[in-house]
Regions:
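Active-/binding-site microenvironments in catalytic and ligand-binding cores
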Residues: 2-197
Length: 197
């Protein structure tokens, strides 16, 4: 028989289920604005769980946001945001407490660099699919460089110089990028979506 959770465990579980993950409601995009939230918990490991967060957590090959909390003129930087049940903002110096209202400033330069890299990854993925029927099966994006794992129908036909030339063609054309707020059902039924795993 599973024992009843303690009051602290129960409260924590209830909060974890209710934390508002704003990045899921609206694509994080570029130039994220600052936002205000309440510190719901400072974890034993030194992380901060907020009442709501616009920070994008690490996952799926995409690095998480970093930034700084500001309260009463004091700055508290946080490292790369992660998520399990809640979005965790790991503090790089202590000093925040439960109930503090903080302004969260996301590192815009980092977010914007990652957004560019993310767009470039989509271009490379599309070019590899169009030219060789390749499917992107994994990736690890970063600010300076990224890795993409491509699965080819016939690996022998692949030419990295051709891939570079094709991808740069689309970059040089300065083609606009559209961001859609689609649910899974729409994604899975749209013919333009290449990889529907």
């Amino acid at each position: 028989m599973t024992p009843w959770p303690s009051q602290r465990e129960f409260s924590k579980r209830a909060f974890e289920l209710s934390q508002t993950r704003r990045h899921l409601e609206y694509h994080p995009g570029t130039n994220p604005p600052s936002f205000t939230a309440v510190v719901e918990e400072v974890t034993d490991e030194g992380g901060v769980i907020l009442s709501e967060s616009w920070c994008y957590p690490r996952g799926g090959g995409q690095p998480g946001d970093t930034g700084v909390f500001i309260i009463d003129g004091k700055s508290f930087p946080f490292g790369e945001v992660t998520a399990t049940q809640s979005i965790n903002h790991p503090l790089l110096k202590s000093g925040l407490a439960n109930g503090d209202e903080v302004t969260c400033v996301i590192d815009r330069d980092r977010r914007n660099s990652l957004a560019k890299m993310h767009s470039a990854a989509h271009i490379v993925s599309a070019v590899a699919n169009e030219r060789w029927g390749a499917i992107t099966v994994g990736n690890q994006l970063n600010i300076e460089s990224s890795r993409m794992d491509l699965k080819f129908e016939n690996r022998e036909l692949f030419d990295k110089d051709q891939l570079t030339e094709d991808a740069n063609y689309w970059v040089d054309e300065d083609v606009g990028i559209n961001v859609h707020q689609w649910g899974r059902d729409q994604i899975m039924t749209d013919d333009r979506v290449r990889n529907k795993r």
